[in-house]
Amino acid sequence: MLFSSLPFLFYFLPCALGLYFLAPRRLKNAALLLCSLVFYAWGEPRFVLFMAAAILQGYAAARLMERYPARRRLLLTLSAVLSLGLLGYCKYADFLISGFNAVTGLSVPLLRITLPIGISFYTFQILSYVIDVYRGDAPAQRSLIDLAAYIAMFPQLVAGPIVRYTDVAPQLQSRTHTVQDAALGARRFVLGLGKKVLLANVLYELVTVYQQSGQKTVLLTWMYAAAYMLHVYFDFSGYSDMAIGLGRIMGFRFAENFRYPFVSGSLTEFWRRWHISLGSWFRDYVYIPLGGSRVRLGRWVLNLLVVWGLTGLWHGAAWTFVLWGLYFAVFLLMEKLFLGRLLRRLPVLRHVYVLTAALFSFVLFDASSLSAAIGAAGAMLGLGHLPVWDGGTLYYLHSYAPVLLAAAVGSTPLPAALCRRIAAGRAGRVLDALEPIALLALLAVCTAFLVSGSANPFLYFRF
C-alpha cells in the first residue's frame, strides 16, 4: 500500500489512527502492530511470514544473549547469518546465479524470487537491535509485541528512515500524545505528500520522455539527469517527511533523513545530508568496526571501498549499483587525500563540483546496464555526434522548466528560510491563520492528481 494512494489516505489511515487513539495506553503498541501488519499484508500477505520469522529470531537472539552472556558472540553470529541469509536469498540469489552463469558458461535457472517490500530496511533495524544488545548499548526487549511494533511500524516499515532501537526504545515504553504533535505531524505528512505527487511524479514524466525518445540530444540528456536526480530526492525525502509526520502524530520522534544535500560543498558533506539513517548505519555497524579511518592508509582505503560497495549493493542487486557505490568511494577518497583542501579554497566551484558529480552518479544509478550509463554520460559530454538540441528538446524545456525550477529552489533551505522570516514579521499571525487552509488546499490538489493519475510507487520501495 502506498502512502500516496487513495485507499491509504481515505480508508486505511483514518481507521488506523482511530484504532490507535481509541486503544488504552497499555494496548497502543499492540494496536500499532495490528495496523502495521494489515498495512504490510495489503498487497502480498505471504510476505508477513518473512518479516515475522525475522522478528522472532532477532527477539530470541537478544533474549538469549542476556540469559547466556558467555555465548553472546555465537548468538550474534547466528542472528546475523539468519537475517542476512534471508535478505540475501530474497534479494541477491538471482544476481549471484547470473554471475555464476557468466563466469562458468552454465545455464543455472534463475529463481525469480519476488522481493518482499521493505526487507532491506527491516533487516537493518533487526541487525542494529541485536548488535546494540550484544554491545550492551540497549537491554533486550522483553515484550515481543513492543519489539515487533518497533520493527513493523507502518510509517517507516517499507522505505525507512532506518530507525535505531536505542533512539525509539524509551518512546515505546512511554510517549505523550498532544494536539500540537498531531498538528505538526499532519503538516509534515501533507508537505511530504506534496513533494511526492506534485514534484517527484511530475519530474519523472520528463525522465520517461527521455527514456522513450527516439532522438536524444545533449540538452535533453542534461535535463533528464537533473530531473531524475531531483525526482529521487523529492520521492525519497517526501516519503521520509510522511513517515516522520505519521510517527509524530502517534507520539514518536524520528530523526531527520535529509538535510538539503544539494547545498553541500563536498561529496563527503553530501552524504552527511543524504539518506542520513543509512549512512550512519553503515558508519556505526560496518565502517567503525572495520577500523574506520584510524588505521594505516591501505587498510583505510579498503574499509572505504568495502563500505561503499556494500552501500551500492544494498540499493540493488546489479553491478551498476555496486559501481555507483564505488564511484562515491573514489571521490570521498580523493577529498580526504587532497581534493578537500582545494575545494575549501574555491567556495563557488565546490558547489558546481558537487552538483556535477551528483548528476553523473544518478545517471549510473538509473541505468539498466553499464553500457547504458556510459552512453548517457557520453551524451552529456557531447560525445556520439548528438545535436545539442532540437525542436523537441526546446518543447520539453518549455514544458518542464517551471517544475525543474520549482524543484531546484525547493531542494534548498530558501523556502523554509523565507517562511521563517515572514512568520517572524507582522504577517506571522496571518500566515499562521492561513496555514491550515493552505494545507487542506494542498491535500485537495494532491488528491485530484492521484484521482486522475496512474500508480506512482515510491522508488525506495524496491530496496
Language-model features, listed with the residues they occupy:
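Membrane-embedded transmembrane alpha-helical bundles that form the catalytic cores
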Residues: 1-462
